[in-house]
Amino acid sequence: MRLMVSGGGTGGHIYPALALIKALKKREPNSAVMYVGSERGLESTIVPAKGIPFQATRIQGFKRSLSLENFKTVYLFLKSVHEAKKMIRQFKPDVVVGTGGYVSGAVVYAAARLHVPTLIHEQNSVVGITNRFLSRYVDRIAYVFDAALDQLPVNKMVKTGNPRAQEAAEVVSHFSWTEYGLQDDVPTLLIFGGSQGALKINAATVAAIPEFNHREYQVVFVTGQKRYDGVMAQLKGTTVADNVVIKPYIGNMPEVLPRVAAIVGRAGATSLAEITADGIPSILIPSPYVTADHQTKNANSLATVGAAEIIKEADLTGETLIAKADQLMTNDALRQDMATASKQLGVPDAADRVLDVVEALKRD
């Protein structure tokens, strides 16, 4: 198999692509892979660091208002399509896969024009602008949430789940809470606003710590590296009990997650793939700062089947956080029901499912 993959801009587009590549290398060790990303996106550092061949093209996103900058965007897009065609002719992929982000638009479109089999992967409940554009040109569309079904051509769609879920499901965890000075036999709530941290989640957690101090359950609060010093400054003079641990980040999150009783966090596609793969009950606080409010729609996909509770960011305070946390952490039966619902949404073989579609395209 010769596979070209493109996706970039955010981790939500990059990590599913990396999980797919990992699964391909496991299935076909002699396969050849080329990752095409943007010059300035996160992928330009993350992908080469994984030892994956990487080529870059220059591209930028459209402004949502009428702007002269959009003329530059069109020019760069057409230039990127031209560059991508050269890369495709040189690499000769059997299939080209796009996982979202503007760069995948140019690469997958170029492949379609060259009659190379194409697949896009849509991680969210609300389809992104790039995948909407590509949907009319590609051969197949892999998707995660049923809410995407009425936004794309149904005859091309295959439900696969998010490849990142398979990575999470395959982890064999040897982690112990004793590494954090906590106990393994006490339920632990993880509060995590993402790798950068989330100001509003951090503020609510800081306000809730005096209450968390007196709970029978444990709390691990991950602030985000950049926000750790600010959080600790806010907590100056506040007692933090032994059942509460504050961390700037967790480097081995896939090993930690299977030990978590419940999680408080955002509703990004990658996070939800990992949460459901491990069957973790969640309290989701969708980011209101994302396109088309897609995190709320992602969260609703879990909440409607009883796998998650939702707190709108506008309603998030120390009091509302404590109330929801107590509701889950003091009720073992509720947590078990939510864990079962979460696990049923998980797709532990998602990367293999996407690969099956890729291999079918190659055969066709």
From Swiss-Prot:
It catalyses: Mur2Ac(oyl-L-Ala-gamma-D-Glu-L-Lys-D-Ala-D-Ala)-di-trans,octa-cis-undecaprenyl diphosphate + UDP-N-acetyl-alpha-D-glucosamine = beta-D-GlcNAc-(1->4)-Mur2Ac(oyl-L-Ala-gamma-D-Glu-L-Lys-D-Ala-D-Ala)-di-trans,octa-cis-undecaprenyl diphosphate + UDP + H(+). Pathway: Cell wall biogenesis; peptidoglycan biosynthesis. GO terms for molecular function: undecaprenyldiphospho-muramoylpentapeptide beta-N-acetylglucosaminyltransferase activity. It is a peripheral membrane protein. Belongs to the glycosyltransferase 28 family. MurG subfamily. UDP-N-acetyl-alpha-D-glucosamine binds at T10, G11, G12, N124, S195, I250, Q295. This is UDP-N-acetylglucosamine--N-acetylmuramyl-(pentapeptide) pyrophosphoryl-undecaprenol N-acetylglucosamine transferase. It comes from Levilactobacillus brevis (strain ATCC 367 / BCRC 12310 / CIP 105137 / JCM 1170 / LMG 11437 / NCIMB 947 / NCTC 947) (Lactobacillus brevis). Its EC number is 2.4.1.227.
